[in-house]
Amino acid sequence: MAEVITEYRNENTKDIDLLSTIDMVRKMNEEDQIVAKVVGEEAPNIAAAIDVIAKAFLKGGRLFYFGAGTSGRLGILDASECPPTFSVDSTMVQGIIAGGEKAIRNAAEGAEDNFGAGREDASILTEKDVCVVISASGNPKYLLGVLEKADEVGAATIAVTCNSKGHIAEDAGLVICAEVGPEVIAGSSRLKAGTAQKMILNMLSTGAMIKIGKTYENFMIDLKAVNEKLKDRAIRIVSQIAGVTNSEALAALL
């Protein structure tokens, strides 16, 4: 197996089990400060990925996130927020997790080792689509199967990882590698690695939607007003852009 940085022991937290609760929290927060800086260093690669995704959207393509465990759940989370935020069809951005729907709530640890399942799940891809594989370690065989199938159909491939020595970093067309270092608890990649992945996915989907015109300035002008909070937001957006009262904005929206 390739070297896995996320499995290393963090020298800064060796005594975490002996700390007071407040010192434990401060130690975790200290480690979290690393994440934003490391993600920022990947800005050029993130920007390149956004341009690839936006170009695919404009040509009728879709964005697929593939991952196992925490990484898969983060992909599903990001995908699920796109329809209400940007008023896009639920098929435009999709998250797929190793092990299927049941793995969203319950750990399916062995699923990440299934190369064939990755190929099968990736059979949904076409040459118009973008395939983003997400993994802290960069080594799940499931994702290697996804990448192999994606290459066969001609889909663009992007790896989001925290390990430059992982296999997906070798196989993907574009790599975003946020090496956040060893976790507070050795191997618990839901922590710093998961935070880094969430930040990156936020930028990928939001950036691509901005590029295809889903915002005006920094307003989400294509939102679906499906609840009271979003209806109120729609009124405020129209009011601020048009320079009218909330009542006038509401009347225009009805």
Language model features with spans:
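Gly-rich Lys/Arg/Thr-decorated short loops/hinges at beta-loop-alpha junctions or inter-strand turns
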Residues: 29-35, 95-105, 216, 234, ...
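Glycine-rich phosphate-binding loops that contact phosphosugars or nucleotide phosphates
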Residues: 64-199, 208-212
